[in-house]
Regions:
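Catalytic cores of nucleic-acid ligases and guanylyltransferases
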Residues: 1-162
Length: 162
């Protein structure tokens, strides 16, 4: 999901180009509160269970009820300046600075220094999915699915009740 702020307008744009701002008002309010004129933040909307773990099924029911949060992992544009050509470390540092003090609706995604298999084993033990991030749509995106995660066990649905 891209959180796009341009002046006073905030949109939450899905991969399919749909604006979900009306569904996630807490995220919109958090982006509106940022001390910038404009920005584009790349992230994933999540809802957490009572243990603080992302829960896909819970997110389905949060479509019309906050709290859902945007787990931010990249800053693509800031105050009209494109950052896509900057190193990911610089973009993440600017994103961390931008989100510093943000209390609700937006969180900075964790970065792990451990090797991928170690991180995946921790995610698997927690019942989480697990993805490796790369900016933009790419064939290099690697999503290793945990077959035991609740999101993998659910039945496919055509409509989320939007």
């Amino acid at each position: 999901m891209l959180a796009r702020r341009d002046g006073g307008r905030v949109r939450l744009v899905s991969r399919r180009g749909l604006d979900w701002a009306w569904r996630f008002r807490m995220i919109v309010a958090a982006v509106e509160a940022l001390a910038v004129r404009s920005c584009i933040i790349d992230g994933e909307v999540i809802a957490c269970d009572s243990n603080g773990l992302a829960d896909f099924q819970l997110l389905r029911w949060r479509l019309h009820h906050d709290p859902a949060i945007l787990c931010a992992f990249d800053l693509l544009e800031l105050d009209g300046h494109g950052l896509r050509d900057e190193p990911i470390e610089k973009r993440k540092a600017e994103l961390a600075q931008l989100l510093d003090g943000c209390r609700h609706g937006l969180v900075l995604n964790c970065v792990f220094d451990d090797p991928g298999p170690v991180v995946f084993e921790h995610a698997r033990a927690l019942g989480c999915e697990g993805t490796r991030y790369a900016a933009g749509r790419t064939d290099n995106w690697l999503k290793v699915k945990n077959p035991g995660a609740p999101a993998m066990l659910r039945k496919p649905e055509e409509d989320w009740g939007g």
